[in-house]
Amino acid sequence: MSQFVFTSESVTEGHPDKICDQISDAVLDALLTQDPHSRVACEAVVNTGLCLITGEVTSTAEVDFINLVRSVIKEIGYKDAQAGGFDANSCAVLVALDKQSPDIAKGVDTAEDHTDDPFDKIGAGDQGIMFGYACNETPELMPLPISLAHRLARQLAKIRHQGTLKYLLPDGKTQVSVIYENNEPIAIDTIVISTQHTSEIDDLSSEADIRERITKDLWEYVVKPATSDLKLQPNQEKTRFLVNPTGKFVVGGPQGDAGLTGRKIIVDTYGGYARHGGGAFSGKDPTKVDRSAAYAARFVAKSIVAAKLAKRVEVQLSYAIGVANPVSILVEAYGSGKMSNQELTKVVKKHFDLRPGAIIEQFNLKNLPSKRSGRFYRDTAAYGHFGRPDLNLPWEKVDEKAKELIALHN
């Protein structure tokens, strides 16, 4: 019998790094909505009273970037200086966007050694490695720790937007530690929530009283509703519940910490339960395999688990710039598969087209923003890119592919 504790974290949409991810993806959405062939690599930086967007864009779209940035910040909840120390109306917004390098554009536009197949003509936008993962711990086939951390972060933001707890401010983080026995989750060991709040709550002003009040409220309005439908429930007597462990969290958001696009890549994926290739997602158009191939790798892994060919699977893909076909494909099932890793890898090579052009076409990645009223990627930029039944993500829809695999290999 082997037992261990695994921990994952999430952050709310008001976290400085997540503000930047959402801004970068809002820019991407706006450009792709007007011009689906836009090439975008947009980074954002926020600090006290400042937002900078920079990077490379080649597009025929015309976008009011300054007003777009302000609208994102405002929707998150930074509507005035009292709402977390960052004001959408008065912060400086700087724009420094260049065009995509012609050397990179050439690699995408004309793949090396391409055939008459149109998908062979589109090369990867960069070299790199990407990982996808799935397991049978949750209905959405995600690891339980990151799934729970996202649930708590979403619920925390939800009650703030609804005004349930009027003292809540936009910045926040959640963390969940799960006890495993023989690789199966058996209990929730610890929950940590750090949430920004006003300096006073009702008639309370002492740090101890405020912390006690927040702790009681968050268990009632965040933890309980976020976990009510789970088989594995937190226990108020056995589960450690830590809230704002330093005592208070008044100064937060960009006033408390600078934020950058792409600094929450583990939050965006599997909470550390699987490996990560290092490439961030937000602000990148679908020709960037950091994003599109990571989505495809998740689709492959989830399809395998949904077909019950394995209980948990990690898929590694690698690419070279300007080359359409993956350089390598590797499947690791950790001994949980109905066949060997080598056989599973053969299944993937036979049944999944992992060329960038095919991935873009299968998931309609260039057209999703225009199909969804100008907003798609921005909604993936907070609370995870995977295991999101609320967003109707094409790389999460594996039923048909799973049926195909079941018919062929069961």
UniProtKB/Swiss-Prot annotation:
Residues annotated to bind L-methionine: E56, Q100, D257, K288
Swiss-Prot/TrEMBL cofactor(s): Mg(2+); K(+)
EC number: 2.5.1.6
NCBIfam families: metK
Name of the protein: S-adenosylmethionine synthase
Transport in keyword set: no
Keyword tags: ATP-binding, Cytoplasm, Magnesium, Metal-binding, Nucleotide-binding, One-carbon metabolism, Potassium, Transferase
UniProt family annotation: Belongs to the AdoMet synthase family.
One GO CC term on file: cytoplasm
Binding site for Mg(2+): D17
Subunit annotation: Homotetramer; dimer of dimers.
Pathway: Amino-acid biosynthesis; S-adenosyl-L-methionine biosynthesis; S-adenosyl-L-methionine from L-methionine: step 1/1
Catalytic activity, as annotated: L-methionine + ATP + H2O = S-adenosyl-L-methionine + phosphate + diphosphate
Functional summary from the UniProt entry: Catalyzes the formation of S-adenosylmethionine (AdoMet) from methionine and ATP. The overall synthetic reaction is composed of two sequential steps, AdoMet formation and the subsequent tripolyphosphate hydrolysis which occurs prior to release of AdoMet from the enzyme.
Major location category of this protein: cytoplasm
Region feature (Flexible loop): 100-110
Group of enzyme by EC: transferase
Residue sites binding K(+) per the record: E43
Entries under HAMAP family matching the protein: S_AdoMet_synth1
Pfam families cross-referenced by the UniProt entry: S-AdoMet_synt_C, S-AdoMet_synt_M, S-AdoMet_synt_N
GO biological process: one-carbon metabolic process; S-adenosylmethionine biosynthetic process
Gene3D superfamilies: 3.30.300.10
Cellular compartments annotated: Cytoplasm
Record flagged with keyword Magnesium: yes
